[in-house]
Design a protein with these regions (language model features):
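Beta-rich ligand-recognition domains in immune and ubiquitin systems
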Residues: 1-144
Length: 144
């Protein structure tokens, strides 16, 4: 993944970058965390996926496993995301997959975190129609 200079966008590069080892870098997946994490309050951000066919977006705990080789190797529910392989939409955690059938195929998503209520909701940012909400007990810093 290539991060823009202003650190506001990311895209899939043509080839893998040769970067020094960093314990905060995800090894097995195409993942990047936002610079700011949240430990309280209500927060909203938007993610534009454009016309991409395969993508995933969401949030993760600060301690989300970054060196595991497969999502199934996680012991805790540390990542919550919405994604598609171009054919079907899914709500995903490290241990669960829920198939979704949205009426729309948004190009821009809204993500709403209510830390105290333990909710992470996904919306079509253009129509504000609800897509899916995860309920969890966060108990640590959450990153977009």
């Amino acid at each position: 993944l290539s991060l823009s200079l202003d650190r506001r966008s990311v895209k899939l590069g043509e080839r893998r970058q040769d970067l020094p080892e960093n314990p905060k870098r995800f090894q097995a997946d195409y993942c990047v965390l936002g610079a700011e994490g949240f430990t309280s309050g209500r927060h909203y951000w938007e993610v534009e996926i454009g016309g991409r066919r395969g993508w995933a977006l969401g949030a993760a705990r600060e301690t989300a496993g970054r060196k595991e080789r497969s999502p199934g190797s996680h012991q805790k529910r540390e990542i919550w995301c919405l994604g598609t392989n171009g054919k079907k939409y899914q709500a995903l955690t490290a241990t669960e997959q829920t198939c979704l059938a949205p009426n729309e195929r948004p190009r821009r998503f809204g993500v709403y975190l209510d830390y105290e209520r333990g909710q992470l909701g996904f919306y079509n940012a253009e129509s504000m129609s609800h897509i899916h909400t995860f309920n969890a007990s966060f108990r640590e810093r959450i990153f977009p």
